[in-house]
Amino acid sequence: MSDEIARLVADVFELAGLLRRSGEVVAAREGHTQARWQLLSVVSDRALTVPQAARRLGVTRQGVQRVANDLVVCGLAELRHNPDHRTSPLLVLTENGRRVLQAITERAIVVNNRLADAVDPAALQATRDSLRRMIVALKAERP
């Protein structure tokens, strides 16, 4: 079974790389990067501090800070006062940021639909269920 897990992990890494490259192409067609797209997406539901966004994305705070600064300069997001933390403002999308996110998301839906056509829906759901169980198991092992 460990050989099967190792092969699955290799496939997941390969797929993740392909999805990252595909995401870069999708975002680039709207004149943006995947890093911008990810940060726009993660703060689209509610305002977050840069450290909160970094934790959600699983990346460094410094990397997110650079992208957040870029979004602010481009008028896609703004920093607002955080009543819970004087020195860590909240990153909030502007209307322009929401429009850009929507445009990128619409392009991504086209790509996702093509991917969905390549896989049986039941097999896709079973795969996702298995991956979620593995994620839960790995999180439980964390010290």
Curated annotation (Swiss-Prot):
GO terms for molecular function: DNA-binding transcription factor activity. Transmembrane segments: none annotated. Keywords: Signal. It comes from the Bacteria. Residues 1-27 form the signal peptide. GO terms for biological process: regulation of DNA-templated transcription; response to stress. PANTHER family: HTH-TYPE TRANSCRIPTIONAL REPRESSOR YETL (PTHR33164:SF43), TRANSCRIPTIONAL REGULATOR, MARR FAMILY (PTHR33164). This is Uncharacterized protein Rv2011c.
